[in-house]
């Protein structure tokens, strides 16, 4: 396995954060990102960038972090018990975008790199990441295009890559207590190191670089769609699923909280406004029912 180069990964991640923020500002056309740099007592730090109350985006957060620690937290060793007790270095860019218009989907993306070390043993390293889409009023053409772009990103790395990481995304972003997916999926990968550092890093870069290619056309297509209070209330209700998933199941959120990460940055993914409603059921045949009937179970889109 080729030797990992954390400095090269960090340089890419910082540049990716800059480029994604610039792209989102251009899409919004009004609001700007505010940067907030922070340090962590146990080692490392990062920069959170948040755009609020824009013309298109109600809130968009793009976070870079690079943290080190003396012992891997439980969230990171639950499926890798052999790593317990190792020191670690983790870096990544993660983002969540909550649009104003309910016809624009919420989206999340993340790319990350881990190294776990122990004296007298080779370092264990891996890449992870992906992106996923959470529509409120879905359009089939948007979902198919999103998945076609995902497939195109994966294609140079092998025909088996897209179906594998698409399936993993469907399984990961699932709420067992609701028996529904968080959205329409995308890509999710973790523990990526089998092909060696260069190839694994190349795939992580392709996913990070491909995010705006997948998302921007959907924003452009839907940002001027008219909506009213009904659509807004449904958007706020469905945002509740986002909160439920992130606080109950998401490994990244748990990792951040368990490692003494910066709470404001970790919870940047939360929607600025959200509502719950007791025993909500969409009206049969309504646009809201279309989401439940056709988009919250895994499907083959391409």
Swiss-Prot record:
It is found in: Cytoplasm. Substrate binds at residues 94, 110-112, 260-262. The lineage of its organism: Bacteria, Pseudomonadati, Pseudomonadota, Gammaproteobacteria, Alteromonadales. The keyword Cell inner membrane does not apply. This is Oxygen-dependent coproporphyrinogen-III oxidase. Homodimer. Pfam families: Coprogen_oxidas. Keywords: Cytoplasm, Heme biosynthesis, Metal-binding, Oxidoreductase, Porphyrin biosynthesis. PROSITE patterns: COPROGEN_OXIDASE (PS01021).
